[in-house]
Amino acid sequence: MNTATRLNTATRPTTVARRCVAAALGVLLLLAGCTSGDEDTTPPPVPPTGAPLPSLPPYPEDTHPFGAHWDWNRYDEFLPYLRKLSGSATYHEISWCSIEPTAGQQDWTALDQIAQRSRELGIALNIKIRTEMCWATGGTPEYLRGTANKTESTMPLDMAAYQRFVGDVVRRYAPYGVRQYAIENEVNAPQYWRGTPEEFVTLVTAAAEAVHAADPTAVVVDSGISSVAYGFGVVDRLVRAGRDDEAITAYNAYFQRRIGTRGRKIPQVDTIETLRTALADETNSRNVAFLAATEQLIDDGVVQLRQVHYYEHFDGVPALLDYLSAENPSDVPIEAWEVGQFWRDGDGDDTSRAEEVVKVSTMLLAGGVRQVMWLPLGYNPNNRAGSEVRYGLLEPDGTEREAGRMFESLAVAARGATVSPVDQDGLTGVAFQRGEESTLVVWSTEVNDAVRVSPVPSLQTGAAGADLAPAGAEVTVSDRPMLLRAAGSPGSILADVD
């Protein structure tokens, strides 16, 4: 994907306010101790109040915005489906401590293979650079995750050495086409970052200098604040603005599948007092503080691309988009590197869950998010949860699910197309226009109120993931996503809607 580098270091009007919020919350975190937290793995919507997010330019020929993140240890199983996603983007996380476990002894073998395979697939690779904890940082980790025993990150002992490592990464992988580098991952979570928001700002500033020294065309990306933390950022903004009823509505829409999963951290909320208590929780205060620090980096131009993580119900997307339209500078692109479906013990069938994949992905894209990467491509049956907490597009062995077929149909429709939102006469969704042809992915906003579309010449229709067939008489669109394809603009296809 083409990316426009933004290196404007002028202070924006919101920067001073963000620094005040981050500093105040940082003090609260220090007073509270901030040493515990849960790992983020990745009602009606709030009416939009911010300015619309900028429209997206056409995707270059043979590229599209629907990517995924997968376990490279199962590359062979996933390969047939990955070929269908050619033209998309993905990311891979590395750490200084894993690449250079002993000072001066770097091993790039695994990452070289990933970069080479990504290039062969035609999938753009983004790299997340973490420190973790080892000789380069000192200290003893409190958290060990996975079979690789990944640890939290912290500040380097020698910042110049850290910058040399970051520069090594950029110089090595620029020839593979890597242009976007995220610094750390979900730093709002203690198991990913041991340090203050101020220390994180210092680290990213140093990393950005090294990235641009090695490749002036490269783009620095934030850590990707967690999905849960973004939810608390959404409601904190509304509460601070005195929009209490909207805050309660947004909270219950956003967290409807999380309520009760973390005890008092994400409680049932029906009063503003309960919501204020939740916001004051130590973990949730940390979430908001690190979101403010991230936005300071964006406002200052240190970070040129905002990375969003979203694992919630599609009812929460409008509130997130409203937040982003209000808080994100208009010249800073947004990409969702982690999009998924968190639903512990979810009871939805394969079709309804697949349709939700379509709705969440297209709503984000229609709202101005230019990349959507689904996580996981296929879940790990041996995960510590012992169940599929986040829904995969594929079975663990690579067998394509209905969700995978639907997601692929979005990639086909979007390849090389111009994206625009659809919001007309009870229909919502997204439109992809390529040349003289348009494909719309739409559904009715009301569960029990179908919308009727009069067919235009050449109109083909069908469910997402299914073969499209010529439309005969009037087309009925329910609350289940449907594809409409015909010659002409999106407006001409929807010229007669009832």
Map each language-model feature to its residues.
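C-terminal motif of bacterial Sec signal peptides marking the signal peptidase cleavage site
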Residues: 31-33
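Bacterial signal peptide processing site
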Residues: 35-38
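N-terminal substrate-binding region of glycoside hydrolase catalytic domains
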Residues: 47-170, 178-192
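Active-site groove signature of glycoside hydrolases
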Residues: 165-197, 221-231, 301-312, 336, ...
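Noncatalytic carbohydrate-binding groove/subsite architecture in carbohydrate-active enzymes
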Residues: 198-356
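Aromatic/acidic polysaccharide-binding cleft in carbohydrate-active enzymes
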Residues: 345, 349-407, 423
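Carbohydrate-binding surface patches
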Residues: 423-457
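C-terminal beta-strand-rich structural cap/linker in extracellular carbohydrate-active enzymes
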Residues: 468-498
